[in-house]
């Protein structure tokens, strides 16, 4: 199973280090020296972590395959994918899900389907679900129990209790 754990940002320095947007709860485990990542696009990898360090709140990685800033620049935007056989929802954590489990679920308000989950954006305060409506509009929904009280992976839906105006805030015809 493949799990998206990070996205490469801009180069840092001249020796090929890059900044990484961390998309995992366990960066110390995932980004340790020797870890091997598949990449998207596949032409960028695989990449093997040589060094991992934090500069303030930013993760800096050095890869064995990257030894200068020019090569590091070509990796900007590359997704880092961790391959594992042991990724499954932990039964003891009934309120934890992986992004791949949520994408494609119907988003319902009451019994009405208002869209589908198209992405999960990890943020410092709380994660945001990206709901794509039938009209193709994207709505960002805070992934908190008060707004998303029910997630039923087996049945293929999430239930929303959105605050007033959440689905209208970005509509072009709402003015």
Swiss-Prot record:
Pfam families: PRC_RimM, RimM. The keyword rRNA processing applies. It is found in: Cytoplasm. SUPFAM superfamilies: PRC-barrel domain (SSF50346), Translation proteins (SSF50447). Keywords: Chaperone, Cytoplasm, Ribosome biogenesis, rRNA processing. Its main location: cytoplasm. GO terms for cellular component: cytoplasm; ribosome. Residues 94-166 form the PRC barrel domain. GO terms for molecular function: ribosome binding. GO terms for biological process: ribosomal small subunit biogenesis; rRNA processing. Gene3D superfamilies: PRC-barrel domain, RimM. InterPro entries: PRC_barrel-like_sf, PRC_RimM, RimM, RimM_N, RimM_N_sf, Transl_B-barrel_sf. The keyword Zinc does not apply. An accessory protein needed during the final step in the assembly of 30S ribosomal subunit, possibly for assembly of the head region. Essential for efficient processing of 16S rRNA. May be needed both before and after RbfA during the maturation of 16S rRNA. It has affinity for free ribosomal 30S subunits but not for 70S ribosomes. HAMAP family: Ribosome_mat_RimM (MF_00014). Belongs to the RimM family. The PRC barrel domain binds ribosomal protein uS19. Binds ribosomal protein uS19. This is Ribosome maturation factor RimM. It comes from Renibacterium salmoninarum (strain ATCC 33209 / DSM 20767 / JCM 11484 / NBRC 15589 / NCIMB 2235). The lineage of its organism: Bacteria, Bacillati, Actinomycetota, Actinomycetes, Micrococcales. The gene is rimM.
